[in-house]
Amino acid sequence: MKKIIILSIFFCSFSVKAQDNLLNLLSQDNEPIYITYLFKSTKVVNGQSVELPSKGVLQFTIQHRFGTLNSGFYNLYGLDNSQVRLGFDYGIKDFLAVGLGRSSTTKTIDANSKLRIKRQIRDGFPVTIVANFAAYVKQWQYTDNQLDNFLFTNQLSFAHQLLIASKINRDLTLQISPTMIHYNLVETLDEPNDKYSLGLGGRYKITKRISVNAEYFYQLNDKINNNVLSFGCDIETGGHVFQLHLSNSAAMFDRAFIHETNGNWLDGDIYFGFNISRVFTLNK
């Protein structure tokens, strides 16, 4: 009798444990599988991608742009002319990051924040959505006579973007970027303060560590300058991402390359450049 009772207790406990394991497996099966690594970098080429630094990770980026290739051998096809942007991006949360940078030629300081609203899910939600907000201020040198007419707010401009990307398959990612940029001060009365554009971009992986990227921004209500078209190649080497670029814009922040591009591909106004990114884990 005792043996029967002991065996009954054993089988009951085993049955309960097996049922718990089965429920755990079913629960795990119901958990969403998020799609990651849509791009290798926080940039597609010049523009922002849906990628953010992870929580507690600081990303340091050196961006370098040379002169136009059609400047001739005397300027070594643009290599004698260069400008630099230094940028820092930090992940506050896995869904929230902030950034700060400065460009040498235009003397512009830019700050931005990126908020991930929704993530692509395997066999579920088809896209990743990120909101990007940025502010820009141009540094000026002015004399005492100009100080009375100088307004700091006139040097400010702002960008609002919705970055929507989808990883179509293991190699191909596409992104669309509706953008609005506001200028506090414009040059003429006919020029709008609010300028709208639509960005299209994508990347295709050639190998595990190398991808080719392309990006185009079409200006919807501002026809003063040219639309920017850029091509790039991303090379991942451990903790670094090395990016090579060709573009008709030398600018390295959104406001400038979207709405202030004068270069024309057909005229040979092509700028070569590169980015080097390094990440540091500050807080796990």
Descriptions of predicted regions:
Residues M1-L22:
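Bacterial Sec-dependent N-terminal signal peptides
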Residues S197, R209, N213, N226-V228, ...:
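Short amphipathic alpha-helical segments
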Residues D171-F217:
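A mid-sequence, solvent-exposed acidic-amphipathic segment
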Residues Q19-D148, L156-H160, A165-I176, M180-N184, ...:
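Transmembrane beta-barrel domains of Gram-negative outer membranes and organellar outer membranes
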Residues S15-V16, L38, K208:
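Generic alpha-helical secondary structure signal
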